[in-house]
């Protein structure tokens, strides 16, 4: 009986020690590296705006699969609202290196829909997988480049789905090589856990940003890059605006 009691006591002590070594579930989770409600945090809200006139791009002419795609498709490279708000601009808080804070918490996809990539622009954490798929009844392709380097080139019949991992930071341009010359999309891969893409009004919101001073980077496929400084204070909304001009677009 004494031997059995000692064995049970040893087992309990061992399990207790193991629990201390492993830590709590929150400490070992990817979620633990995200800002929590108990930490001082604020919000960033802003807008990307185009100042001055610009020439609205003409639609692309379609040369292949016109029976499905039609004779032309819209050019999504510069979408501007009535008050100058720029859609599909990427906003990233620079200087926060925390790739685990969001990686794996969301599903990312690039679809072929109505002869266009959807979404046209997205931002994903470095290390994420992206699902490539095709909801059109015609053959598509996803040819991804970072600069001049090909990351992947995948044929996509309507039945095929493929996952690809994005393991490096940078701007990835995706095109369709199946003579769909108008098709393009951009995937911005970042290690910052705080990012956004502007909506149709050119606006964005980034929640739960730890209090502090930051640089914010703005990028748009046609308008280029800008950087702004911002102070985030606990419980407050910090406002920022990036204004671009369009000399060559």
Whereabouts are the PLM-identified features?
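N-terminal secretory signal peptides that target proteins for export/translocation
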Residues: 1-8
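Bacterial N-terminal signal peptides
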Residues: 12-26
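Extracytoplasmic copper-binding redox domains, predominantly the cupredoxin/blue-copper superfamily
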Residues: 30-249
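Short, positively charged
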Residues: 8-9, 107
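Short, low-complexity, intrinsically disordered N-terminal modules
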Residues: 3, 28-29
